[in-house]
Design a protein with these regions (language model features):
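Residue-level marker of positions within ordered structural domains that often coincide
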Residues: 20, 99, 103, 174
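Ser/Thr/Pro/Gly-rich low-complexity linker/stalk segments immediately outside membranes or between
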Residues: 22-42
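Secondary-structure boundary elements
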Residues: 35-131
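Hydrophobic/aromatic-rich core segments of domains that either
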Residues: 137-210
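Long, hydrophobic/aromatic-enriched structural stretches that serve as scaffold segments
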Residues: 97-104, 134-138, 142, 146
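Intrinsically disordered, low-complexity, compositionally biased regions/tails
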Residues: 7, 12, 199, 214-216
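N-terminal Sec-pathway targeting helices
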Residues: 1-22
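Alpha-helical and coiled-coil interaction segments, frequently adjacent to or embedded
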Residues: 203-227
């Protein structure tokens, strides 16, 4: 009887695992992701808000018109963006162009040259995909070539023992006088409830305060959205 009881328990465990893996896979994944999200949000709340920045700097962005023209011609960006488009629409179009052509992967061979043209050539001759940092560098240069001020930012956790990170672009929107996060690697951007694009700092504040963040997918496929 004991043997049959153990066998019965094992069968139940196996059946449960199979159901979790093949039948309720999405539900289990959603539950685990939500649990992890709640845990991370609690850590953000414990960390508190950013200390007000009292330091200011005067600096100018260096412009390389020759390189910008080279990039625009190489990528035929006149077919991707138009001069009459608002800054944010241009930025989304460029991010969508990158996301459609280069998926995410942790490359096995690191490219020797990290500029827009050489990164593109890398995906056509060595590996077809690469990580978030290289995504951000490529998008950074495409945006700059169209006169769009932007930065690529490495997001680190506060935990010194956690080596994970993610790299995204911050785009300056002169029409709105604000920064906005754009992520061609994970194929998304973030908005508030009114449709205004959010910066990284604004996203952090909203997580802490419990306010809504609406994530928008860059591509049209249901499977491209991984936030």
């Amino acid at each position: 009887m004991v043997g049959w009881s153990i066998l019965g328990i094992l069968l139940i465990v196996v059946a449960t695992l199979l159901l979790a893996r093949f039948v309720f896979n999405k539900q289990v994944e959603a539950y685990l992701c939500n649990s992890l999200k709640n845990e991370m949000v609690e850590k953000l709340k414990d960390a508190g808000k950013y200390v007000p920045d009292t330091t200011s700097y005067n600096f100018a962005y260096q412009k390389d018109s020759v390189q910008s023209q080279k990039i625009r011609e190489y990528f035929k960006l006149d077919t991707v963006v138009y001069s009459t488009m608002p800054t944010w629409d241009k930025a989304i179009s460029l991010a969508r162009f990158v996301a459609e052509n280069i998926p995410h992967a942790n490359q096995k061979i690191n490219p020797k040259r990290r500029n827009a043209v050489d990164l593109w050539k890398y995906t056509r001759s060595i590996e077809p995909a690469f990580n978030c940092r290289l995504h951000s560098i490529l998008l950074h240069e495409l945006l700059l070539s169209e006169g769009i001020v932007n930065r690529f930012v490495t997001c680190h956790p506060a935990d010194s023992e956690d080596s994970d990170c993610h790299v995204v672009n911050l785009v300056w929107l002169p029409e709105l006088q604000k920064w906005a996060m754009l992520d061609s690697d994970m194929n998304a951007w973030a908005e508030d409830e009114k449709g205004t694009p959010l910066s990284l700092a604004e996203m952090r504040e909203r997580y802490i305060d419990g306010r809504e963040i609406v994530y928008r997918p860059l591509l049209n496929s249901e499977n491209d959205f991984v936030y």
